[in-house]
């Protein structure tokens, strides 16, 4: 044996020696111990993480989950029923016995076939989905399956949000297990079928049955049940009413067949039922009878703004998200007590509807569009300015479809000379720049004034002349534009806008000049709506009867949750000081002149003191009147949604309407003056 071979043999023997074998064993031992410790640590960390998520889960309120049959309700100022809340979400809650067995079986078959066996989560399905998704990743497929049970989906729809995260999924699984301890399978399934999104604004099988088939859910046949059962996985993709699916219905037809196949496989329907249903689809397809009719509330003009305001106040007070507050309003069983005076609301509507009130407008005031809606429109708002409670709010003239444009609350327009008390004379007097007897010259602007006001051409008065020196009282009575421009120039644009914004007016980026602050000519860019409306103006003019204090206008008095707890209350007014008591009373007294002996004489009624101001926008396209009494403030707007000339004057049309609606509001009220007069 050579020396090299002997050395090789010795090394081989040393490797196999007991000493070396002991080292390998020790290494493997500690290696596996390390792996085990890492595994234990990982499991512990994951366990702590999961436990922390579970502890942060919202409390399971079984009653809230099942409270879908408690729609939010609105009441008038006497506590009488007014309206059910109707949102864009269409939902008609049905009881278990109204839901066909075939519809229940269709959903269980395609969504959760072991629904009646598991306790809230389907372990077998979870591992199956994990394996399938891993296989899909390895094969390059992008298909990802879900493992949510019907119970989990109910938790997601009723309690959690649609956020995609591990945290949300863990909460969902935990709450599903908890829910199964409190409700029977049928209770869970029924609640699920009342909450499931079914495409568009439809939630629940009853709304879907109405939308697709114009049927009560109890009248659905087997094919219709199978279609709805398959719809929920991808409502848009399987929507039989979409234009794409009308041209090529194979997608939703095949999905419906898949549901029927699964129902047959699980023994929910017989072979004969299955074959008949498949033949029906192959022969006739699925016959849809769409029903897209929107529900209309009893007091459309008042109800929708009240809901909007309640939603915003809930978000401000409780930091709800938009999604959360929408769910609460739609399904939370709230009781919303509005400030609406039912009789006054109805009577104001009648006055605005009456064609006789528009005879002075020669531009065909009773012309209607293709939907039968008057082209000439009107809106009005009446407010108790001491409490801020809105007593009547009408957003349009004549019968109009549901969800029509509310011109009193949501619209913003130029307000014309109605701005003069708010952003010209009120601020001037409040800032000590003048009083009712102070003189301003109604004359053309000097070159210096043209330069400082930004006007290129000489502005004009509506009466096409100049009156020379006028007191503030005279200038506002005849609505001198030149006088207003000069006073507004002294006040300063920034000061005027500051007053206007506190009073509720909205100034866009292109409406921050003297023509806006002095004459109320807002640019009203469609991308930046600005100006005011009757809701804004009625609230703003109430300042002059309330010692210069603006009380935030509210359309409701209180809101109760489904358990009767008060969650919003407006009994304590939200107040903002705008003018001094002295300034506000001087303006109030000045505004009485236009009603007593000016262009708004028709606004007067009975022996109640009335103060107010007309408003006209460029080209006679908007007519307004805003004013107040010692009891209420109100505002009227008349115009076209697509502005056009009306060929008369604001005082001729708006003042009589103001007098009529305020006369109704003051029925049986006695003479008095505004409170706390400043001598």
Curated annotation (Swiss-Prot):
GO terms for biological process: cell wall organization; peptidoglycan biosynthetic process; proteolysis; regulation of cell shape; response to antibiotic. The chain crosses the membrane at residues 31-51. Residues 1-14 have a biased composition (Basic residues). Cell wall formation. Synthesis of cross-linked peptidoglycan from the lipid intermediates. The enzyme has a penicillin-insensitive transglycosylase N-terminal domain (formation of linear glycan strands) and a penicillin-sensitive transpeptidase C-terminal domain (cross-linking of the peptide subunits). Residues 52-679 are extracellular. One of its GO terms (molecular function) is penicillin binding. One of its GO terms (cellular component) is outer membrane-bounded periplasmic space. This is Penicillin-binding protein 1A. The keyword Cell wall biogenesis/degradation applies. It comes from Clostridium perfringens (strain 13 / Type A). Pathway: Cell wall biogenesis; peptidoglycan biosynthesis. It catalyses: [GlcNAc-(1->4)-Mur2Ac(oyl-L-Ala-gamma-D-Glu-L-Lys-D-Ala-D-Ala)](n)-di-trans,octa-cis-undecaprenyl diphosphate + beta-D-GlcNAc-(1->4)-Mur2Ac(oyl-L-Ala-gamma-D-Glu-L-Lys-D-Ala-D-Ala)-di-trans,octa-cis-undecaprenyl diphosphate = [GlcNAc-(1->4)-Mur2Ac(oyl-L-Ala-gamma-D-Glu-L-Lys-D-Ala-D-Ala)](n+1)-di-trans,octa-cis-undecaprenyl diphosphate + di-trans,octa-cis-undecaprenyl diphosphate + H(+); Preferential cleavage: (Ac)2-L-Lys-D-Ala-|-D-Ala. Also transpeptidation of peptidyl-alanyl moieties that are N-acyl substituents of D-alanine. Its EC number is 2.4.99.28, 3.4.16.4. Gene3D superfamilies: Biosynthetic peptidoglycan transglycosylase-like, DD-peptidase/beta-lactamase superfamily. NCBIfam families: PBP_1a_fam. Residues 378-663 are annotated as: Transpeptidase. The active site is at residues 111, 417. It holds the Pfam family Transgly. It is found in: Cell membrane.
């Amino acid at each position: 044996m050579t020396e090299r071979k002997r050395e090789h043999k010795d090394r081989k023997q040393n490797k196999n020696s007991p000493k070396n074998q002991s080292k390998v064993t020790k290494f493997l031992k500690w290696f596996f111990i390390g792996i085990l410790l890492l595994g234990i640590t990982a499991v512990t960390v994951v366990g702590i993480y999961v436990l922390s998520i579970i502890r942060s889960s919202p409390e399971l309120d079984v009653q809230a989950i099942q409270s879908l049959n408690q729609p939010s309700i609105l009441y008038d100022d006497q506590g009488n029923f007014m309206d059910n809340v109707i949102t864009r979400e269409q939902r008609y809650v049905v009881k278990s016995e109204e839901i066909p067995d075939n519809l229940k079986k269709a959903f269980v078959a395609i969504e959760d076939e072991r629904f009646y066996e598991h306790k809230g989560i389907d372990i077998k399905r979870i591992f199956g989905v994990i394996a399938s998704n891993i296989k899909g990743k390895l094969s390059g497929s992008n298909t990802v399956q879900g493992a949510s049970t019907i119970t989990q989906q109910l938790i997601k729809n009723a309690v959690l949000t649609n956020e995609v995260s591990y945290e949300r999924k863990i909460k969902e699984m935990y709450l599903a297990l908890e829910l199964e301890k409190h409700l029977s399978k049928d209770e869970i399934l029924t609640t699920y079928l009342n909450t499931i999104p079914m495409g568009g604004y439809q939630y629940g099988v009853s709304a879907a049955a109405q939308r697709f088939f114009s049927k009560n859910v109890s009248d659905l046949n087997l094919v219709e049940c199978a279609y709805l059962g398959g719809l929920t996985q991808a409502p848009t993709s399987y929507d039989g009413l979409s234009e794409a699916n009308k041209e090529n219905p194979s997608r939703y037809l095949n999905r419906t067949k898949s549901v029927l196949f699964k129902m047959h496989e699980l023994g929910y329907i017989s072979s004969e039922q299955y074959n008949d249903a498949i033949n029906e689809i192959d022969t006739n397809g699925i016959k849809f009878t769409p029903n897209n009719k929107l529900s209309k509330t009893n007091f459309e003009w008042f109800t929708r703004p009240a809901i909007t305001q309640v939603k915003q106040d809930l978000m401000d007070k409780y930091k709800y998200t938009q999604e959360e507050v929408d769910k609460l309003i739609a399904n939370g069983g709230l009781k919303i007590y509005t400030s609406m005076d039912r009789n006054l609301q109805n009577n104001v509507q009648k006055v605005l509807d009456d064609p006789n009130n528009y005879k002075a407008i020669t531009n065909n005031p009773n012309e209607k569009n293709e939907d039968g809606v008057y082209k000439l429109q009107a809106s009005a708002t009446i407010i108790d300015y001491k409490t801020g409670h809105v007593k009547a709010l009408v957003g349009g003239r004549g019968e109009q479809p549901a969800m029509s444009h509310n011109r009193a609350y949501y619209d913003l327009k130029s307000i014309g000379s109605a701005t003069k008390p708010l952003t010209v004379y009120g601020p001037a007097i409040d800032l000590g720049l003048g009083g009712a007897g102070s003189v301003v010259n109604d004359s053309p602007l000097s070159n210096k004034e043209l330069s400082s006001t930004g006007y290129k051409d000489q502005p004009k008065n509506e009466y096409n002349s100049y009156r020379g020196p006028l007191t503030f009282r005279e200038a506002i009575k005849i609505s001198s534009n030149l006088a207003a421009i000069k006073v507004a120039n002294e006040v300063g644009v920034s000061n005027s806008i500051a007053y206007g914004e506190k009073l509720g007016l909205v100034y866009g980026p292109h409406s921050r000049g003297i023509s806006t602050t002095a004459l109320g000519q807002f640019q009203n860019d469609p991308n930046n709506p600005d100006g005011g409306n009757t809701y804004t103006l009625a609230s703003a003019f109430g300042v002059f009867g309330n010692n210069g204090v603006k009380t935030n206008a509210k359309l409701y008095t209180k809101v109760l949750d489904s358990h009767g707890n008060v969650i919003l209350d407006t009994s304590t007014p939200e107040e903002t000081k705008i003018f001094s008591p002295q300034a506000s009373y001087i303006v109030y007294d000045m505004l009485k002149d236009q009603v007593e002996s000016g262009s708004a004489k028709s606004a007067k009624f009975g022996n109640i003191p009335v103060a107010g101001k007309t408003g006209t926008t460029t080209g006679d396209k908007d007519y307004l009147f805003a004013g107040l009494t010692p009891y209420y403030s109100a505002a009227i707007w008349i115009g076209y949604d697509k502005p056009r000339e009306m060929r008369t004057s604001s005082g001729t049309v708006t003042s009589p309407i103001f007098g009529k609606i305020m006369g109704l509001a003051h029925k049986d009220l006695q003479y008095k003056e505004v409170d706390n007069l400043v001598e």
